[in-house]
Amino acid sequence: MKTVLIIGADFVPSSLPPATRIRFFVSHLPEFGWHPIVLTTKPEFYEGKFDPENEHLLKNDLEVIRVSAFSTRVTRKLGIGDIGMRSLLQHWKAVKRICSSRKIDSILIPVPPSITMVLGRMAYRRFKIPYVIDYIDPWVTNSYKKVPKTERPPKWALANALSRTVEPYALKHVAHLTGVSQGTTDSVIKRYRWLSDKRATEIPYGAEAADFEYLRSNPRRQTVFDTRDGYFHISYVGACIPAMHETVRALFQAISQGLRDSPTLFSRIRLHFIGTSYAANGNAPRDVQRLACEANIGELVDEQPARVSYLESLQLMLDSQVLLLLGSNEKHYTASKVFPCILANRPLLAIFHEASSVIDIMGQTNAGELVTYSDKEGPGLKVGNIKVALERMLRNENALSQSNMDALRQYSTSAMTARLADCLNSITSIG
């Protein structure tokens, strides 16, 4: 069995997307002849909340090595909170120690935190071990250029300059790129002439049914809303960045029109936006609430910027009448949460760019109501379509999801990990 060292500053018990993606991979890599070693950070150095129960989702025999990080009590004075930056030195020391004493066949680095990708090139220079960078989110992005300066993150200009300087260095000797969508890796390849699409593979998050099986056996009590209060609860769980605000505005305009045309029906709606901020402490502006007030539906919308744990987010999905998925002004944006939304077996409303892979996934699985927009016809021109979809769901509130779970098998986390194993095999000249 070959060995892959997976470097991820965020890992279980963290509930952040990179931690979940790594967990999905390591749960299935042994099925395909790969022994994973996870190199990560000690939980006490995480800035955000974490959930110890997430550890029940790990395999008992998983090998995990944890290192320290610089405390935010010190680094925040320098404007640094990113766990990747705070643990970079400690991770590099551990990489040198592991690669000097163990036979490591390949290295996998999921990003974000994106600065961690430099460890791939550093390890390659020292040990000649081929490395793969796995893009969950792009590091270099122009998405914030399309939004007003007042809505951009305060340190975006500095972060943008850092990404454009460090990313090409980190990718210079990369053996392979993987990403949650082809659009993500295509944008990277377009920037750097030494990369080729033959060295890139699309690997969506995938659907892990075992997580829902665990939750149904160990249900949690969510405190966001009361399932017995008679309202029609629609939930969106996850970050809502400025690049998504145009879609949010279209949704709110549709509800506003619905309140005008069918007040009795639409007044039952309660929209919940949970975990909308990447800020570790959740002390972020309530942009969604602001947009709701601008549309005069503020009393129907509840925004909680602080992230909830992974298992609590799944419980919210199970308890909601309808689940909501929203696209952004990046046409290839793919919401990884599409898979748990389908597995929750709840009615689903998705509003996405026609080029997003979410369109294919929902089409193949027959997973709910889908409203698409394009470069020529943005979300603002689809308000009527959104209103019609909402009205249909409100009038059939007891309808069950008709998702094709058999079609979802091609997107299982095991199937996605098989793609990763093929990549690792190709760069180590086996299989």
Regions found by a protein language model. Give the residues of each.
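A conserved catalytic-core segment of Leloir-type glycosyltransferases
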Residues: V38-S101
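Carbohydrate-associated surface elements
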Residues: G183, G206
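N-terminal subdomain of nucleotide-sugar transferases
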Residues: M1-I65, H176, G258, P263, ...
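Membrane-proximal helix-turn-helix segments that form the acceptor-binding/catalytic region
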Residues: I115-V118, M122-R126, W156-G179
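Acidic donor-binding loop of glycosyltransferase active sites
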Residues: A175, Q315-K331
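Conserved donor-binding/catalytic core segment of Leloir-type glycosyltransferases
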Residues: F225-H245, F252, M416
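Nucleotide-activated donor-binding/catalytic signature segment of Leloir-type glycosyltransferases, i.e.
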Residues: R268, H272-S277, G282-R307, L311
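Acceptor-binding helix/loop patch of EC 2.4 sugar-transfer enzymes
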Residues: A9, S71-G81, I98-R102, I129-R164
